[in-house]
């Protein structure tokens, strides 16, 4: 009985590892897609964009 339990646990671990390694199916559209730069302005550009959208809390001193 103990050997059967160990065998079932090992099988479950192997199956879950196989699913993690394979992941979801690779779609043809994903393979052909051109990667885009989500952070084209860098960290500073991202910060300035947020600052412009939300407004400056120190209005007289904002540049």
Curated annotation (Swiss-Prot):
Composition-biased stretches (Basic and acidic residues): 28-39
Residue(s) carrying 4-hydroxyproline: 57
Region (Disordered): 23-49
Modified residues (D-tryptophan): 58
Gene Ontology cellular-component annotations: extracellular region
Compartments it resides in: Secreted
Propeptide regions on this chain: 24-54
S-S bonds: 56-62
Modified residues (Cysteine amide): 62
The keyword Signal is annotated on this UniProt entry: yes
GO function terms (MF aspect): ion channel inhibitor activity; toxin activity
Domain notes: The cysteine framework is C-C.
Species annotation: Conus striatus
Additional record remark: Exists in two forms, due to cis-trans isomerization at 56-Cys-hydroxyPro-57. The cis conformation is the major form.
Task performed by this protein: Its target is unknown, but this toxin may modulate voltage-activated calcium channels (Cav) or calcium-dependent potassium channels (KCa).
Name by which UniProt lists this protein: Contryphan-S
